[in-house]
């Protein structure tokens, strides 16, 4: 099958037999360049075709800015990083989070003043003092942000023409390095569809890419995205600990934190805007968006 074919198979099956992972997750982004990446991706899709990636400046690993056409938008409990798009944001952003994952459905991501955690049945998002709980039917590893894309890169390589894999290492761990750029023509449609919950293009942002895949599991250990030869995003896992036991209390809300449901917080928010929450079906995203716009 060849080295490229072997790498495709490895990445397709990621994270393979991985049981647990503990790491530091560092993300860097350049806001204006990311905005240009998304603009070009929108242009490539063409008129009348919805691009699954929001056409806004979204930081790698960041929660997407509000998209009025996304019915799940008000359910996105991804507070690990701030929403991008505000005019007063700095040109560049650098953040580091502590990540611990026990596959398939338990995780903890702790950033500066923000956290997201799941015990496999429920998930929580918020701060060390207040978290919002949501039903596990929406709890997927993609909710943990960039770590989801790193663990499940899936069809990412199928979108790229990439170089012959080169053996490298990160912190002494063997990996495969490739550089790639978007496929064009009929080849761009080949390969299996990407996992929709991971939003790969949003998390691993760039027109051109350099990627380091773990040789044993296929997970992304490092990604560097660029546009017109200029870097726009970096996502890196360091301080790696693979397959070591993890305590069960890692996957619970912080001790003493107030736990509230999304409905409770939404009701309070609507009331603070002068809107009677009893007049809004809080399970209907269309009604919720209309009410929020009314209160602006």
Predicted regions located by residue number:
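Non-transmembrane domains of secretory- and envelope-associated proteins
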Residues: 1-7, 202-208, 216-296
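A short, Trp-centered hydrophobic/proline-enriched beta-strand micro-motif
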Residues: 13-85, 107-109
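Short, hydrophobic/aromatic-rich segments at coil-to-beta transitions
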Residues: 17-24, 104-108, 172-179, 195-197, ...
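Generic short beta-strand segments
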Residues: 24-31, 179-188
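An acidic-aromatic
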Residues: 61-151
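Short loop/turn motifs at secondary-structure junctions and domain boundaries
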Residues: 90-91, 158, 201-205
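Hydrophobic/aromatic beta-strand elements that line small-molecule binding cavities or substrate pockets
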Residues: 95-100, 121-122, 165-166, 208-213, ...
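A short, structured loop/turn motif at beta-sheet edges
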Residues: 165-176, 212-217, 243
